[in-house]
């Protein structure tokens, strides 16, 4: 009889303990890491990703227009150091117009290729694990953009490079630069073999990141740019820091 009573008592204790554990668990915020002001780390992460995604959409839309790179002082693709001596040589012999066309077409290729960048960047954003959402939210104006760039640049380069290669041929940049390099090598007796595909890919990706950083900074500093409830809730937290 004592064993039965003891067993019933133990069962009651275990059931009571389970109920208490469930109550405690229900009070723990969802997501990993410490949140801020009642907003979970997971929700902060979602807000940061949404801001980055909006930055990509806005940046790609602007850069993908004619002169989106070429006449934007922040993102214009300039010649790499290796080709600056080629540019000077052409101008010295009266072929400045050919040099101008070569530079312009590098930017035209970026403008054409970047129209296909949005899904590539979006995939990188959505699959990115934000380990310190709180720290990023309370960081500098471009903290989320810098985090994305540091963790996805190689992935983005691999996915975006074929698009740039296609665009270089599409806009005629390959043809013009073959003429330029052939002319330069013939005149100087030197051999210059630039990897324009890799260079334009790198510069185009940098250009998108600059636009994303600008958008992130705007969302952080301008309440009017927080156009969704999630952005308002998450970035409202950094206003109180």
Residue ranges and their predicted role:
Residues 1-4:
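Positively charged n-region of N-terminal signal peptides that target proteins for export
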Residues 6-10:
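Hydrophobic helical h-region of N-terminal Sec-dependent signal peptides
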Residues 14-17:
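C-terminal motif of bacterial Sec signal peptides marking the signal peptidase cleavage site
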Residues 19-22:
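Bacterial signal peptide processing site
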Residues 26-105:
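N-terminal Sec/ER secretory leader and immediately downstream segment
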Residues 59, 129, 223:
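Residue-level signature of catalytic and energy-coupling elements of molecular machines
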Residues 96-167:
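Mid-length scaffold segments of soluble, non-membrane domains
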Residues 139-159, 163-166, 170-241:
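Amphipathic, charged alpha-helical segments and their helix-to-coil junctions
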